[in-house]
């Protein structure tokens, strides 16, 4: 844990990390908030689901573009405009009528204007710390973001029931704008400049490390979302039990990230972490005792954050600075696509075979994710696995420039 203590002593690290997590908090609220609000307006879960899907599509399509703009035009103008447009769109949806066309349009606009904070901050991490500190910072970020998916849905549900269904959307708009402003003020000493590189849009996808990270994270997120469907189908008779079960997996991911994420994880360790996810997921489908199911879910979560942080670190080391934001934008889009694919496949499997169908889909997807690094390594060397700038760099990292 010393690696994390060294991190918090670096001036600005805590402020930057906390501000970007706060600004991204609405991502954990939006899906449920929009579902509850649109269903209340229209009386249709189908229409509400379509608007939520429109948000996901807008974000998946636009994120690589806005992330690239942050690297080309500058972080401050890109994030500022995106936050203002996204916040205004959320407010518009909160007070819009029940017109399906208007709601769908606002859904796409909300998704397309989500500030590319994740790509930007992960491209900036190597500028904040050096040597082993980068590894620990990626681990801390990946682990801490679990809080978004724990706090967000709870906050959305509470506000919708205690105040109104518009309340979580209004809060999301405020947090997006204020959180982005906080992040920009916190990161101002980094002086992010406009990238000088001239690579064409999408060229970063020719990098084998980026492809590996994107495909693996897509499958891993798809597995987790499919598992959520299986958990709800199996334990959904009591909403509290299902929610607690999902939280147990998230706690496992958080603990796994804290204990393992900052360590030197090569390809073999990444495969082992992904295999743990697959094994834990499969065990959840096999055991029929609630306590054992919780243990299996905790075990499945242990490998999630360490594997994701290692993949992000590989990409950070491998891609050129001027392509970093776009690369992480593609990873974000891959994760969004994975979530949609996992949920859809698990839904079909649940209709046909019950909860075991969704869990089987989740286990298969996690197994495929574990195979990806092995296939990539068999095809040739994977860049970014080792630090080319020398692991000898002292972990006592300099303050932000």
What are these regions (language model features)?
Residues 34, 115-129, 306-319:
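Intracellular juxtamembrane helix-capping segments at the cytosolic ends
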Residues 21, 100-116, 218, 293-306:
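Hydrophobic core of transmembrane alpha-helices in multi-pass small-molecule transporters
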Residues 2-60, 204-249:
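Helix-loop boundary and gating motifs at the non-cytosolic
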